[in-house]
Amino acid sequence: MKEPIQYHNQEELNKFLEKGVIIPEPQSVKIERSINLPQIGKGTFLHPFSRIEGEQSYIDESCEIGIAGAVTILNSGVGKGSRLGTLGPVTIKDTFT
């Protein structure tokens, strides 16, 4: 059976905030523990219900994730200045294959 995904806790999320990642509602954002500080760029805005999973995932600087709806980044990269939003849930998955 696959192990459940482990997410950063509030104290760990604070390190992303200190680095310049903008998370207005940290209790609603999930970042997998395999994601390290350098993998999410300064000035990136993570809207409520954003999820970042997969150890290969990264988000460059000045991105906006989860505009108008839930977005999941799964083993994928998001380029500098990208804006991801939706009218419903979106998953971006395995963009490196």
Specify the residue positions occupied by each region the protein language model found:
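Domain-scale signature associated with acetyltransferase and cell-envelope carbohydrate enzymes
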Residues: 1-97
